[in-house]
A protein has these predicted regions:
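Alpha-amylase-like alpha-glycosidases and glucanotransferases acting on alpha-linked glucans and related
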Residues: 1-4, 11, 17, 54-198, ...
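Intrinsically disordered, polybasic Lys/Arg-rich low-complexity tracts
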Residues: 510-544
Length: 544
């Protein structure tokens, strides 16, 4: 970032709306307008790929595809592909503050299939003018490197009751050319459906991004370093990963015990075969980052430290304690990316156990790292205390992996930590503890400060997005539209402007005093006399 600014972390899934989950529709545009009113410059989101078991956006079944749940149904209706009665009366959940992913899975695809049936009535045909011709063929052409394999993967997966691809019949699991061709021939309509879903996602996303950019808002996206074991990428590109001839991972990803989890984190993602990537000059990574930069303005790369050294866990282990550190590609990867793509607007998530070699890689890359206030209260002059933040970093009170500030203060801090927080941040009841902590982040030297929407709303643990190591109850929280008030936007704008992260609010013009209403003129004695004597004079004149 070239100047001090600030933004809000708000997952697309957490946007308000009536259909079970946030989408790329009017509520997203309303949130962009809220950001503008609040003087913000950046909208940070979580990964937008399709989710699967566990609902985690960091365990997507594709490194390139978009989440079908985010497709706005009202927009499909406006495009003539749905009727409001196709979806408006469906039960999308009983609690509008949380996503019910099981219900979404049961009902969303049925609605999207109705839209696809309408789309087929306007099927793009080369040489004919239809509403979708140009956009459809442009999309399928530009997505040719990943879309066919993704559609094939999803169609086969559905045919096999959504089971992991490693359990499919061997000819399909191991991509026998004859078996794949027979499947394509017999399931052409199903392949078309999955392509249609991705087309609609791309169309709506680009329209939303264009709207945000037109308002001066940059979108900071997020890509996980790894892909899921059960993904189109792993199935179609086994050579990219440490896998045996049957497609089973030899080792899997995770991280050692740390602040978040005493047993470490066993993610289960297949590890990259970095030797293969080096031989191909990181072509797959170039495609992946190019795609990400086509949908985001700024790119946060999760688990940056894994490019220096990564935690490799034997497949089959029950936790992450048995892993060991292995050497990653380092600057070799980022040099290849810069050669192919030019300047890289990347933010490095450099949290967790950080070695000197990771710090050296971050410095050589030139990417800003991250600082998190919730890691700071250890009784020392911690580098995570805001006065120690370098300018070239992104400052957070907490991330999606942390509790909210209120939940953290109430449930996770010790009396000593609360005492330190009160003294360091000069917390007062009048200002409020949460506002005081946010003040500390905004006042820091960091060029960019990002605050979660839940923290601006001063929510408790009920609004936490993710608890690492806990497989249930994550990624569900949603904001209520009524909470995004002009008063809150003004507070955010005032605090951001106070620390030169936003333009000052225009001063209210002083109220002009109303001029006193004109009073009727007082009647003079002469006027009264004139009025009194006038009838007498008239009578006298008549008598003559």
């Amino acid at each position: 970032m070239k100047k001090r600014c600030s933004g809000i972390l708000m997952p697309v899934s957490s946007l308000p709306g009536g259909y079970g989950i946030g989408s790329m529709g009017q509520a997203a545009r309303d949130f962009v307008d809220f950001l503008v009113l609040a003087g913000q410059s950046v909208w940070q989101i979580l990964p937008v790929g399709p989710t699967s078991y566990g609902d985690s956006p960091y365990q997507s079944c594709s490194a390139f595809a978009g989440n079908p749940y985010f497709i706005d149904l009202d927009q499909l209706a406006a495009d003539g592909l749905l009727k409001p009665e196709d979806y408006a009366k469906e039960n999308w959940g009983t609690n509008p503050n949380y996503c019910d992913y099981a219900l979404l899975y049961q009902k969303r695809y049925k609605v999207l299939r109705k839209a696809y049936a309408a789309f087929l009535q306007q099927r793009p045909v080369p040489g004919y003018d239809t509403p979708y011709s140009d956009d459809w063929y442009r999309f399928t052409f530009l997505s040719d490197a990943w879309l066919p394999d993704y559609c094939l993967y999803m169609a086969i997966k559905e045919e096999n009751k959504m089971c992991d691809w490693q359990t499919w019949p061997a000819p399909l699991r191991l991509r026998d050319p004859k078996a794949l061709e027979e499947f394509r021939t017999g399931h052409a309509d199903e392949l078309g459906f999955w392509a249609f879903v991705q087309y609609e996602f791309a169309k709506q996303w680009q329209a939303l991004k264009a709207y945000a950019n037109s308002k001066g808002i940059k979108i900071m996206g997020d890509i996980p370093i790894y892909v899921a074991a059960d993904s189109a990428d792993a199935w179609a590109g086994r050579e990219l990963f440490e896998m045996d001839s049957e497609g089973h991972p030899r080792r899997v990803a995770g991280c050692p015990p740390d602040y978040f989890a005493e047993d470490g984190q066993l993610w289960g993602n297949p590890l990259y075969d970095w030797a293969y990537h080096k031989r191909t000059n990181y072509a797959w990574w170039v495609r992946r980052v190019r795609h990400a930069l086509s949908i985001y303005d700024i790119l946060r790369i999760d688990h940056f430290r894994g490019f220096d050294t990564y935690w490799a866990i034997p497949a089959g282990d029950k936790n992450a304690r048995g892993g060991k550190w292995e050497q990653g590609p380092g600057m070799d990867l980022f040099r290849a990316l810069r050669t192919a793509l030019g300047d890289l607007p990347i933010v490095a998530e450099d949290l967790g156990e950080i070695f000197d070699s990771v710090r050296a890689l971050l410095a050589e890359s030139g990417f800003p790292g991250m600082k998190v206030l919730q890691f700071s209260l250890n009784g020392t002059d911690s580098l995570d205390l805001p006065h120690n933040y370098p300018a070239h970093c992104v400052a957070y009170p907490g991330t999606h992996d942390n509790n909210t500030l209120r939940g953290w203060l109430e449930n996770e801090t010790t009396p000593a930590q609360r005492k330190q927080a009160k003294a360091y941040f000069a917390l007062t009841e009048q200002e409020g503890e949460i506002t005081g902590l946010l003040r500390g982040v905004l006042a820091s030297p960091a060029e960019l400060a990002i605050v979660t929407m839940a923290d601006w709303l001063e929510k408790g643990s009920e609004a936490r997005m993710n608890t690492p190591g806990n497989p249930a109850g994550n990624w569900q929280w949603r904001v209520a539209a009524k909470d995004l008030t002009p008063a809150l936007a003004r507070k955010i704008h005032e605090m951001s402007a106070r620390y030169f992260r936003a333009e000052p609010l225009p001063e209210a013009e002083p109220k002009k005093e109303k001029a006193p209403a004109p009073q009727p003129k007082a009647k003079t004695a002469d006027a009264k006399e004139e009025k009194t004597t006038a009838p007498a004079k008239k009578a006298a004149k008549s008598a003559k």
